[in-house]
Amino acid sequence: MAKTIQAIRGMNDCLPTQSPLWQKVEGSVKRVISAYGYNEVRMPIVEQTHLFKRAIGEVTDVVEKEMYTFEDRNGDSLTLRPEGTAGCVRAGIENGLLYNQEQRLWYMGPMFRHERPQKGRYRQFHQVGVEVFGLNGPDVDAELIMMTARLWRELGIDQHVRLELNSIGSLEARANYRTALVAFLEQHLDVLDEDCKRRMHTNPMRVLDTKNPDVQAILGDAPKLSEYLDDDSKAHFSGLCELLDAAGIQYQVNERLVRGLDYYNRTVFEWITESLGAQGTVCGGGRYDGLVEQLGGKTTPAVGFAMGLERLVLLMETLELTDVRRSVDVYMVTAGEGTLMAGMKLAESLREQVPGLRVMCHFGGGNFKKQFKRADNAGAAVALILGETEVAEQTVNVKDLRNGEQVTLPQSDVFTKLAELI
């Protein structure tokens, strides 16, 4: 017997029992984003490797350890996208979307990182990204945060997430801060683990988000980034906080929040839950005003966020917010000569007259008991039953599968009855 082929570790199937909750989350995401007038963009999942090296930073964990990179038959180095912002910027530059104009874009799709798989962290994962180009004020930062807050309310998880904010300032301010931070860390080399020592020389601000409790203990005495911020960044952050206060959105300023990608500046933020253990970040974003120019475009202010769908789905499962619409509304049961075709025609008529109604026809024969069992397994609320008599008389038996009540009606009245039952 041939060996069974299995999915790649960290890359999971979404099965029919799981997909309704995914569809609910995706539907809510699309409704909320569309309510703000943003437009969808779709990019390839494979990009040239140097795009991510230039955008994310060559000394980040993503580029150094986590990317799926390979050579194609032409010898070009290609990478499965580990995040969406770089590809969105590339698409905007290449297609002239960012030339002296404002763009508000969103995308949804799979991303890939070679990490150790664990609950809430996978090698193929799905992200929703929202990106705004051409606006540099704190007002659009606030709108993005308000958008995410609206989504949490729609999903029913707003009481289970909290917002953390920070400003990491301009490039010059961060350079001055890095010098002070490295000087501080060099005084505590005996406490730093090997990963922190490596980061101290490549990307010292990443030491701030270490999970090592011994290092966390000394960071309380480390220089504070807020003391090195330029005046423009301070004013921008103050304006953002005022807008969030006016909107009634609660937040906590976390001076150690720096995000893991090099392209961020000024505003950074994360939405965090305590319900998922170590994988608590469900959404993160911030400003990246230099990235468009860094990738070959004109100087263009930009801000955005990304959220992981796996973690949102996992959070809703953890909170038992899994009540979703059934996959089948009506199940067509037929028995006798010529009844199957009559049932298929009636089902097609229902689909045309009631958009969104989900009608499943029984195929494969079998007695009524077998067909009703299939209807229950499909999760249908109502069964429509056609025998030879009903076909001849243009009637149909309508059975409510939730309470067993059954009535016989003219086929022309079945639409009205279904509206009552579903």
UniProtKB/Swiss-Prot annotation:
InterPro entries: aa-tRNA-synth_II, aa-tRNA-synth_II/BPL/LPL, Anticodon-bd, Anticodon-bd_dom_sf, His-tRNA-ligase, HisRS-like_core, HisRS/HisZ, HisRS_anticodon. PANTHER family: HISTIDINE--TRNA LIGASE, MITOCHONDRIAL-RELATED (PTHR43707:SF1), HISTIDYL-TRNA SYNTHETASE (PTHR43707). SUPFAM superfamilies: Class II aaRS ABD-related (SSF52954), Class II aaRS and biotin synthetases (SSF55681). It catalyses: tRNA(His) + L-histidine + ATP = L-histidyl-tRNA(His) + AMP + diphosphate + H(+). GO terms for biological process: histidyl-tRNA aminoacylation. Its EC number is 6.1.1.21. It is found in: Cytoplasm. Belongs to the class-II aminoacyl-tRNA synthetase family. Keywords: Aminoacyl-tRNA synthetase, ATP-binding, Cytoplasm, Ligase, Nucleotide-binding, Protein biosynthesis. CDD domains: HisRS-like_core, HisRS_anticodon. It holds the Pfam family HGTP_anticodon. Homodimer. This is Histidine--tRNA ligase. GO terms for molecular function: ATP binding; histidine-tRNA ligase activity. One of its GO terms (cellular component) is cytoplasm. Signal peptide: none annotated.
